[in-house]
C-alpha cells in the first residue's frame, strides 16, 4: 500500500441507499435564478420556489454532495428528495425548525 492510497470496494457505490425518497414538482415563481445546494433543508428554500413545503420537511435534494440544482425564472421541474439522516436536527437555514424534526 502506498501512503494515501485509496482501495475502493468492487462494484458501484449507491448514494443514500435505503433512505426514504420523495418526488416533487417545483416551480420558480420569481424573476431571478435560484440555486439549491445538495444538503440544504429543502422545505426552507427560497420562498419564490412553489412546491409542497410540508411534504418536503426533513428532506434534501437526492444529488451528490457539493452539487446543486438551479431553477431558472418561470421554470418548473421535478426533483427527487431524500430524507435527512443522523440525529435529524435542523438548525439555521431560514430558522423554521431550529431543532428536532
UniProtKB/Swiss-Prot annotation:
Its EC number is 3.5.1.5. One of its GO terms (molecular function) is urease activity. Keywords: Cytoplasm, Hydrolase. Its main location: cytoplasm. It comes from the Bacteria. One of its GO terms (biological process) is urea catabolic process. One of its GO terms (cellular component) is urease complex. It holds the Pfam family Urease_beta. InterPro entries: Urease_beta-like, Urease_betasu_sf, Urease_subunit. It catalyses: urea + 2 H2O + H(+) = hydrogencarbonate + 2 NH4(+). Pathway: Nitrogen metabolism; urea degradation; CO(2) and NH(3) from urea (urease route): step 1/1. It is found in: Cytoplasm. Belongs to the urease beta subunit family. HAMAP family: Urease_beta. Heterotrimer of UreA (gamma), UreB (beta) and UreC (alpha) subunits. Three heterotrimers associate to form the active enzyme. This is Urease subunit beta. It comes from Azoarcus sp. (strain BH72).
